[in-house]
Amino acid sequence: MEKTEEPPSSNNEEDSPAKEKIWCLQRVGRDSDWLRLFEDSEVSVGRGLNVTHQILSSSCPLMISRIHCVFKLNEGRQWTVTDNKSLNGVWVNGKRIPPSTPCILHQSDSVRLGVPLDGNPVEFDYILVQKNFDDVKSFLSGNLGKDSGAASLSQKLKNSKRKFDGGDESEPCPTQHSKSKLYRSSAPDKSRAQPCPSGERRETLKLSSRPLEEDRDKAGSSSSTCSDSSQHLATLHRYNRSLMVLKGRVGDTQKRAAELEQQQTQTPEREKEMQDLQTQLEALRGQLRSQQEQALRRMETLEKSFCEEERRLETEKAQQNEVGLKKQLEEALKEHRKVIEELKHAWQGFKEVLQAKDKELEVTKEEKEKAKAQKEEVVTQMTEVLESELQCSICSELFIEAVTLNCAHSFCQHCISEWRNRKDKCPMCWQNITSQTRSLVLDNCIDRMVENLSADMRERRLVLINERKGERSKSESISSSGGNK
């Protein structure tokens, strides 16, 4: 079932020229529920109440977010669509657009809201078109067509009745007004609509509520209470279906997070992707928790109504002492107990799902901490190798501008220059120094390895390099001044 809501239209729309062209989203495969795009304002689409077009999914209530997306004309007079961080996304020409980023649309582009379920096509599939107002006014949502408005509304209500009564068109409802009326749920999410009780369940309630002729009016109130219980049960079944979809999405998200954690080297892009996945997990957990709270509130309401009905029927039984009323009470109690058991079972299922998700998230955190510890261990080992193999024996620091002597020993260029001012022999083997060569390969290797060290070690090495450059510049200036004299 789907429903669309429009803001009140002004009179100038009725006085528009017959051939005025308008932009709209054409519903694929349907001649109704097209969404008009108003050029002078933003057009929001979602299942919430404060949107331009309200759409509700019949297969999964959480398929469409409260404010799913926004359509708007940009400065270049081009239509754009922006995904408002919806759970199931917006797909333009088969590709999902990034959240909070406007995507330019062209005429005949395909716009899909949500994802397909169980191999079925996407429920909300549209095409951007520009047509004459008179040609499409009967197809627009909100009954913009003047002549066909009442007939279209009547047909929609009849279709809703057929859908929720299991195709039994001959089954009468208590009043003419309630034949095809959609009752609002008492849950906090007011955007979901509740159907009338199904034909089979209403027939059962009617048979169970036939009292004696003189007590017919009092028995009718008990049948109405059972009908309310059936509505709660139908809503709970829809919550179960949406929970299965959420559970599948949580599993996919968790699997992706585990794959990212197994990789030792994490780039900033992967870190960001991991954070996005964790954000999605928290959002899904919030939705599961919200549905659990709604189910608990429904169960409490039903238990309260059950107690009130039980007290009322007990009073009537004591006053009238009629066999028919006693039978009605027993059947009503049986129906209430059945509904309460199903609610308790569903609540237990919600609790198990939340516990499983908490456990999976804890495992993910442990794996991430383990990977971090492994990385720190690698850095520690690298530091030990640098300190033991790539240190200058004169200054006990990592080589800075390493040079290799004729005896194959390596030192810092600054250190060996200072040493040769005193002795022209190798500090390690005491051979005469006949040549020294810069080792660029060794310098590059040390520089690349220093990048993975801690910030303190990198800062300390940078200070040493600057100090030695300053000393070299000072000595060169002294030498040049002495030569001029």
Curated annotation (Swiss-Prot):
<protein>
    <recommendedName>
        <fullName>E3 ubiquitin-protein ligase rnf8</fullName>
        <ecNumber>2.3.2.27</ecNumber>
    </recommendedName>
</protein>
<keyword id="KW-0833">Ubl conjugation pathway</keyword>
<feature type="region of interest" description="Disordered">
    <location>
        <begin position="150"/>
        <end position="232"/>
    </location>
</feature>
<feature type="domain" description="FHA">
    <location>
        <begin position="43"/>
        <end position="97"/>
    </location>
</feature>
<dbReference type="GO" id="GO:0043130">
    <property type="term" value="F:ubiquitin binding"/>
</dbReference>
<keyword id="KW-0156">Chromatin regulator</keyword>
<dbReference type="Pfam" id="PF00097">
    <property type="entry name" value="zf-C3HC4"/>
</dbReference>
<feature type="zinc finger region" description="RING-type">
    <location>
        <begin position="392"/>
        <end position="430"/>
    </location>
</feature>
<feature type="compositionally biased region" description="Low complexity">
    <location>
        <begin position="221"/>
        <end position="230"/>
    </location>
</feature>
<dbReference type="GO" id="GO:0006303">
    <property type="term" value="P:double-strand break repair via nonhomologous end joining"/>
</dbReference>
<keyword id="KW-0234">DNA repair</keyword>
<dbReference type="GO" id="GO:0042393">
    <property type="term" value="F:histone binding"/>
</dbReference>
<comment type="function">
    <text>E3 ubiquitin-protein ligase that plays a key role in DNA damage signaling via 2 distinct roles: by mediating the 'Lys-63'-linked ubiquitination of histones H2A and H2AX and promoting the recruitment of DNA repair proteins at double-strand breaks (DSBs) sites, and by catalyzing 'Lys-48'-linked ubiquitination to remove target proteins from DNA damage sites. Following DNA DSBs, it is recruited to the sites of damage by ATM-phosphorylated mdc1 and catalyzes the 'Lys-63'-linked ubiquitination of histones H2A and H2AX.</text>
</comment>
<dbReference type="GO" id="GO:0070534">
    <property type="term" value="P:protein K63-linked ubiquitination"/>
</dbReference>
<feature type="compositionally biased region" description="Basic and acidic residues">
    <location>
        <begin position="199"/>
        <end position="219"/>
    </location>
</feature>
<keyword id="KW-0808">Transferase</keyword>
<dbReference type="Pfam" id="PF00498">
    <property type="entry name" value="FHA"/>
</dbReference>
<comment type="pathway">
    <text>Protein modification; protein ubiquitination.</text>
</comment>
<dbReference type="GO" id="GO:0035861">
    <property type="term" value="C:site of double-strand break"/>
</dbReference>
<dbReference type="InterPro" id="IPR000253">
    <property type="entry name" value="FHA_dom"/>
</dbReference>
<dbReference type="GO" id="GO:0045190">
    <property type="term" value="P:isotype switching"/>
</dbReference>
<keyword id="KW-0862">Zinc</keyword>
<dbReference type="GO" id="GO:0035092">
    <property type="term" value="P:sperm DNA condensation"/>
</dbReference>
<dbReference type="GO" id="GO:0045739">
    <property type="term" value="P:positive regulation of DNA repair"/>
</dbReference>
<keyword id="KW-0863">Zinc-finger</keyword>
<dbReference type="GO" id="GO:0040029">
    <property type="term" value="P:epigenetic regulation of gene expression"/>
</dbReference>
<dbReference type="InterPro" id="IPR017907">
    <property type="entry name" value="Znf_RING_CS"/>
</dbReference>
<comment type="similarity">
    <text>Belongs to the RNF8 family.</text>
</comment>
<dbReference type="InterPro" id="IPR018957">
    <property type="entry name" value="Znf_C3HC4_RING-type"/>
</dbReference>
<keyword id="KW-0479">Metal-binding</keyword>
<dbReference type="InterPro" id="IPR001841">
    <property type="entry name" value="Znf_RING"/>
</dbReference>
<keyword id="KW-0227">DNA damage</keyword>
<dbReference type="GO" id="GO:0034244">
    <property type="term" value="P:negative regulation of transcription elongation by RNA polymerase II"/>
</dbReference>
<dbReference type="GO" id="GO:0010212">
    <property type="term" value="P:response to ionizing radiation"/>
</dbReference>
<dbReference type="InterPro" id="IPR013083">
    <property type="entry name" value="Znf_RING/FYVE/PHD"/>
</dbReference>
<dbReference type="GO" id="GO:0061630">
    <property type="term" value="F:ubiquitin protein ligase activity"/>
</dbReference>
<dbReference type="GO" id="GO:0000781">
    <property type="term" value="C:chromosome, telomeric region"/>
</dbReference>
<dbReference type="GO" id="GO:0006974">
    <property type="term" value="P:DNA damage response"/>
</dbReference>
<dbReference type="GO" id="GO:1905168">
    <property type="term" value="P:positive regulation of double-strand break repair via homologous recombination"/>
</dbReference>
<dbReference type="GO" id="GO:0006302">
    <property type="term" value="P:double-strand break repair"/>
</dbReference>
<dbReference type="GO" id="GO:0085020">
    <property type="term" value="P:protein K6-linked ubiquitination"/>
</dbReference>
<dbReference type="GO" id="GO:0042803">
    <property type="term" value="F:protein homodimerization activity"/>
</dbReference>
